[in-house]
Amino acid sequence: QLLLVVTFDAVVTSAAALLLVSAGVRFALFVPVGVALGVVPRVPDRHAVDRAWTFARWSVPDQILDRFSYNMPVFVLGVVGTPAAVGIYEAADRFADFGATISWRLSSPLLTKVSGDVAAGNGYDTYLRGAVTGGTGATFVVFGYLIGAHDVVARIAFADARWAFSTTVLLVGGVNVLRGFWTLTSHAMEGLGKPSVSFRTKLYGLVASVPITALFGAEFGAVAGAVGYGVMNLVVFGAVCHYARDVFGYVPVDAETVAHLTLGGLVAASLTASVVAVATGTPLPTPGVAAAAAVAGLGGFSAVLLAVSPPTRVAAHRVVAMVWGRGGRTP
């Protein structure tokens, strides 16, 4: 797709043209692959249609709410706020969202793994806690980095609105720890055939949070968007924990792993702040300071976990195995 877009740059000048390129590439690839694999389309029987409808009637709306919940502050601020507020929130979200994005990427393999194990009659309890908790690990190090370097990041992204940007990026980065957890847990519940539960948790979060951003977005801008985002994630987190007890019989959190990740995040924040304090007084440019702080924070975080956390190492191994194995056996 990228090659075609670059090659025909003069022709691909609209969103419609870009969508056509994407659809054309997929069609050109999927059809030959299907033929090569011997896939023969056929009309599904009534049982297959009933099963598909039972799952899709909740799964499709759930995916829509999932995307809307992620972009809710941008949508609402776009209506009640200013373009500057939208821009500040978008930029802060890009910096703070790296850890939650990794959790989101892990959620599909986790869904597949849980669904496959249940269908095969295999247990999933041995890895669920570690996979969910370990999958949120990146959010801890990102938040630790932002605690120590938010002012440097603000000077890079929005030098004219440093307070608004710093506040927004810290709120979003902090609450993404919860988002990482509930994203993975809700997908695991969906893998057990419970997409309606995942749908309801997001709906509760949106009902509680949209009015906050809508009412205060015009006055407080991006910060109101971040507060609304935080309230939404707190509500969804609480609802997911509540439903997890019914679905799994427990909340899939490894307390020891959380403690070690928290310790690693604190070390990352301390090292990041120290590097920023030292490097700011040198000729190193601001992006260089931010990069040096990131290396120090990530190094400290990794060193702590390698030194004190065997459960975290096991959890990381399971996460990697889950991603690369795509449903294969995990330890």
Stretches found by the model and what they are:
Residues A15-A16, D50-F55, S59, M72-D97, ...:
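Interfacial/gating helices of multi-pass transporter permease domains
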Residues Q1-V39, E90-A96, G221-A244, A292-V304:
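Hydrophobic alpha-helical transmembrane segments
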Residues I88-K194, S198:
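Specific pore-lining/lateral-gate transmembrane helices of multi-pass inner-membrane transport
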Residues A10-L19, V25, L29-Y70, K113, ...:
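Interhelical loop/hinge segments that connect adjacent transmembrane helices in multipass membrane
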Residues S274-P331:
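Membrane-proximal transmembrane or re-entrant/amphipathic helices at the cytosolic face
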Residues L2, V6, F27-V35, F75, ...:
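Membrane-embedded alpha-helical segments of multi-pass transporters/permeases
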Residues Q1-V6, V12-A16, L20-V21, V60-D66, ...:
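Alpha-helical transmembrane segments of multi-pass membrane transporters/permeases
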Residues D62-Q63, R67, F143-G148, V210-A214, ...:
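Hydrophobic alpha-helical transmembrane segments in multi-pass integral membrane proteins
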